[in-house]
Regions:
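Short acidic loop-to-helix transition motifs that present clustered carboxylates
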Residues: 233-238
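Conserved internal helical-beta-strand scaffold that buttresses enzyme catalytic cores
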Residues: 1-175, 179-208, 212, 223-228, ...
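Flexible glycine-/small-residue-enriched beta->alpha junction loops
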Residues: 283-287
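C-terminal catalytic or substrate-handling cores of phosphate/nucleotide-
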Residues: 229, 242-250, 255
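Active-site-proximal helix-loop-helix substrate-binding element of RNase H-like nuclease domains
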Residues: 217
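Glycine-rich beta-alpha junction loops
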Residues: 66-68, 262-265
Length: 390
């Protein structure tokens, strides 16, 4: 890693940690499903985008549950802090109905990211319900449709990324179903990059209570996907795993899994006290330095960065959040997320007095019906099929 890469990695960890701590202290008790303990997810996703672009990636479509979602929205999708904080401040919905009343950690977003090399990559985070892993086949369908629209026959231009919890990855059958379809004609998308935020707890259940295999990724042996087990407290290893995963996916067009071992700094949500159910584990976590502190100490010791420079990064991150909160407090209505852009430009929601025009010309339907009941002259039909056709 070059000195610039190390400093950039440190900066992203600062932003991720400061964001979570800001929400923790300013909005006490509000649910946010913190990423703390797994902040390396942000540079991991950064790396997938930056390393994928020179390998032909034009779009990345992401599906994930609630853990760390706000952090991803803020720092990968660049959803403005003001918009996120306005939802914490209680700003009303705009009343137009598509996401009215939904919680902040279900929301999606899209963003056109320009890489350091100047290449544009379109990023999409799909909306998600509380039902864990339900979004998996939805993402695959979105990517399949995009690839068809772009005539991306090799599947290199649009890449699906699914972020899982380790308990859900083994516990939800929809994961196994999605894996099983991954390389079938009519379903395959050229490989999915799976990221497991392995915080070693499923709400209050330990791994021993949710599976009997050593790793949550063992369920993926059915498709023989390569798995990279990596320690989130070693962010450089996380970045390296992401680089290899993207290169492997682009070259071999198969699923790849990154099993990022980390921990959950607080409870399942902000109303959960984990010391009641995992007292020994949380005694250790309370004494454990954050990924950012560990990496900061490492870079300072190597003389890659001065401590005052690190403090400046923290001050800058806090300052941006403070400014955003002042703006958010003045917003009476939460800013609406733009829904119809890109290839959806010109479309709008159907209303009571407006329905979509779904009609097809009679001549076109007749022509389709005729072709559907014809067989090539040199094709020998089964006699039962022949009676139906003729």
């Amino acid at each position: 890693f070059s000195e610039d890469e190390m400093c950039q990695l440190l900066s992203r960890l600062v932003e991720a940690e400061e964001f979570e701590q800001f929400l923790h202290t300013r909005y006490i008790g509000q649910k946010r499903f913190s990423l703390e303990g797994g902040e390396s997810l942000i540079p991991l996703l950064d790396t997938l985008v930056e390393s994928g672009a020179p390998q032909g990636v034009d779009e990345v479509v992401i599906g994930m549950a609630h853990r760390g979602r706000l952090n991803v929205l803020a720092h990968l999708l660049h959803k403005p802090y003001e918009h996120i904080l306005s939802e914490f401040e209680g700003a009303a919905d705009d009343g137009r109905g598509d996401t009215e009343g939904d919680v902040k950690y279900h929301m999606g977003y899209s963003y056109d990211h320009v890489t350091e090399a100047g290449r544009k990559v379109h990023l999409s985070l799909s909306y998600n319900p509380s039902h864990l892993e339900l979004v998996d086949p939805v993402i695959e369908g979105i990517v399949y449709a995009k690839q068809a629209y772009l005539r991306d026959e090799e599947g290199t231009r649009v890449v699906p990324v699914l972020v899982h919890g380790e308990a859900a990855f083994t516990g939800q059958g929809i994961v196994a179903e999605t894996l099983n379809l991954s390389e079938l004609d009519g379903y395959g998308t050229g490989g999915t990059i799976h990221i497991i935020i392995n915080n070693q707890l499923g709400y209050t259940a330990t791994p021993q209570e949710t599976r009997f295999s050593p790793y949550p990724t063992d369920v993926a042996k059915q498709i023989q996907a390569p798995v990279f087990h990596v320690n989130a407290d070693n962010p450089e290893s996380v970045v390296q795993a992401a680089r290899v995963a993207m290169e492997f996916r682009q070259r071999f067009k198969v699923d790849v899994i990154i099993d990022m071992w980390c921990y959950r700094r607080y409870g399942h949500n902000e109303a959960d006290d984990p010391t009641l159910t995992q007292p020994l584990m949380y005694q250790q976590i309370a004494q454990h330095a954050s990924t950012l502190k560990l990496y900061t100490a490492q870079l300072v010791e190597k003389q890659r960065i001065e401590l005052h420079e690190v403090n400046e990064l923290h001050d800058r991150a806090r300052g941006r959040l403070d400014e955003a909160q002042e703006v958010a407090k003045k917003l009476q209505v939460a800013p609406r997320t733009a829904t119809f852009g890109g290839v959806w430009q010109g479309l709008s929601w159907a209303t009571e007095d407006r329905s979509a025009d779904t009609g097809v010309e009679r001549e076109k339907l007749q022509r389709i019906a005729e072709l559907a009941t014809q067989a090539p002259e040199d094709f020998s039909l089964h006699r039962t099929v022949q009676r139906i056709v003729k």
